[in-house]
Amino acid sequence: MAADSREEKDGELNVLDDILTEVPEQDDELYNPESEQDKNEKKGSKRKSERMESTDTKRQKPSIHSRQLISKPLSSSVSNNKRIVSTKGKSVTEYKNEEYQRSERNKRLDADRKIRLSSSSSREPYKSQPEKTCLRKRDSERRAKSPTPDGSERIGLEVDRRASRSSQSSKEEVNSEDYGSDHETGSSGSSEQGNNTENEEEGGEEDVEEDEEVDEDAEDDEEVDEDAEEEEEEDEEEEEDEDEDEEEEEYEQDERDQKEEGNDYDTRSEASDSGSESVSFTDGSVRSGSGTDGSDEKKKERKRARGISPIVFDRSGSSASESYAGSEKKHEKLSSSVRAVRKDQTSKLKYVLQDARFFLIKSNNHENVSLAKAKGVWSTLPVNEKKLNLAFRSARSVILIFSVRESGKFQGFARLSSESHHGGSPIHWVLPAGMSAKMLGGVFKIDWICRRELPFTKSAHLTNPWNEHKPVKIGRDGQEIELECGTQLCLLFPPDESIDLYQLIHKMRHKRRMHSQPRSRGRPSRREPVRDVGRRRPEDYDIHNSRKKPRIDYPPEFHQRPGYVKDPRYQEVDSFTNLIPNRRFSGVRRDVFLNGSYNDYVREFHNMGPPPPWQGMPPYPGIEQPPHHPYYQHHAPPPQAHPPYSGHHPVPHEARYRDKRVHDYDMRVDDFLRRTQAVVSGRRSRPRERDRERERDRPRDNRRDRERDRGRDRERERERICDRDRDRGERGRYRR
């Protein structure tokens, strides 16, 4: 018996080898999804042909065993998805005839199946998942929606059978690795060989009965599968139409958003190319899995494919792809807010640049520009200093556009916030060789509008009409730029979010209010405009003029504050002081005070009349003041006791005479300085005056000497004539 069984096995192996050699060989490592799909179709057609052959045996011999008794062989046979054929007692020719007939039927059934699948697959060209794995999600939904329990049980059976079929592919790969072939015939042959050896050990009777039970189950499965496939095809067509409509709407919406935002992101074409998203629409990405793992991955991919945005960023890792939907919404919100902020910044910048004057500032190095950005100051040559000061007084805004020599870029632009001032803390500029800090002018305070750089290539289209229409990048330090050209150049700079333009606009308005403040026509306004430190006059910082400037003595300084209500007691004093331009030197003429000598000043001072009568603090209207003693007509009266409380606080004793004390002290100081200056100047001027007098007297002396000489000559001539006459008279006498 053992020898016979071995001979039969050898014969069967030879037949299987012949069948295997008829199939063309393929590379095991290559994976062809189309051949895999053809294999699955052939498997289904083989099951149908085998079912037709087994109908005769089922009618003759009914099933004896229940489904529970054959659960083990059923699982093995269904998992391999092969029809087990008992070859016991069959010759080789009969076996070949059966295989030939089976292959003919399979060809016809395959042709019908391909026609039916081509109609359904043409509607969805980009979906490449096989039919069995693609319908798992819909089975679970249909199970929940089934109205009757019979329908739910039927769908449950379908899901179980499909799960068993999905595990077939992994087992076929194992069998193909063992026997050296991945074709269907080879794997089926190897599985048939293993099953035949098991059936021979268990007995021929059990094999026939198990085959009949499997055939019955296969019939039920095929009927359920056909119904389910028809329903699923209809559902697929409906869902495909819905998915296509949704995708078209999403694509149109994304195109609109892209036009509005004007971004440079790559759109829909990257969705199928990016491997980092782990969303694959190829055939092999789903078929390579097995069982429930493949179904779970497929469900996640379906959800991700529906919710994915057509705008795809380059991301790596699955975590980025999972959190992409939330980040895309944040990006949309951020983009809208950024657009609003940038629009607001642009409008504010245009307001700042309106009616401004633009100057090109050339720096020798980057260090000075960095120092200017850090401290908000700038210094330039005296020639440019005068130009910028005049522009600051006349223009609404003065914009300085900075550029480092040979850098190929603009380093930003700023607005002048003050005129130049001298005498402040020194700024350690990095100066070129041969240049000292004394060669620079004053220090300007500037407010930076943009600290970011702009390459020259982006401003190549701008020319400066005020520099012979040369490119705006060309120019010397202090070159003025035309208004339109300067505005366009500043708008080309990238926006600097770190700058608050609102404060800059507030400073501009404050400066405009100060310059346009109305003044009274009669006399100059008593309220001095409040000058900040940067707007002080250059002479206030003069180092050489170390003497303190004479202070204008207003009665008290409270009225200089804004919102001050004038005290009625000062009306008379103010009217008196307005008549005298300078109270300290009211009796001395201005030309004598400025240009005269000390003697002239003393002479004028002594010729001055008596001081005006003392006028103390006049009381409030309606309050009488006791008359002064005649002795105190021209002098301050002694301090009096505080009057009783009369509705207001009395003026302190020191405040009454503070003005007088300051006035006397200033008088003494000025007199001393005038005397010393007069003495020094007198000493220097005396020899010069003597020389001048001598020079003046020299022509007079010459004239006098000449006249004297002439007079002497005339007298001598007269004497000679007289002497001659006398001599002649005497001679005539003697002759007589």
Swiss-Prot record:
Effects seen without this gene: Embryonic lethality. Conditional deletion in germ cells leads to infertility in both males and females: mice are viable and grossly normal but male mice lack any germ cells including mitotic spermatogonia, while female oocyte maturation is arrested at the primary follicle stage. Ythdc1-deficient oocytes contain large cytoplasmic RNA granules, show extensive alternative polyadenylation, thereby altering 3'-UTR length, and massive alternative splicing defects.
Record-level Gene Ontology MF annotations: N6-methyladenosine-containing RNA reader activity; RNA binding
PTM-bearing positions, type Phosphothreonine: 148
Outcome following mutation: residue 429 to A: Abolished binding to N6-methyladenosine (m6A)-containing RNAs
GO CC list: nuclear speck; nucleus; plasma membrane
Composition skew (Polar residues), residue ranges: 63-90, 186-197, 281-290
Domain YTH: 356-493
Biased composition (Acidic residues): 198-255
Region listing for Disordered, in residue ranges: 1-339, 510-564, 616-652, 678-736
Compositional bias of kind Basic and acidic residues: 1-12, 50-59, 91-115, 124-144, 151-163, 170-185, 256-271, 525-564, 688-736
Keywords: Isopeptide bond, mRNA processing, mRNA splicing, Nucleus, Phosphoprotein, RNA-binding, Ubl conjugation
Signal sequence region: none
Binding site for RNA: 362-364, 378, 429, 477
Domain notes: The YTH domain mediates RNA-binding.
Protein name (database record): YTH domain-containing protein 1
The gene coding this protein: Ythdc1
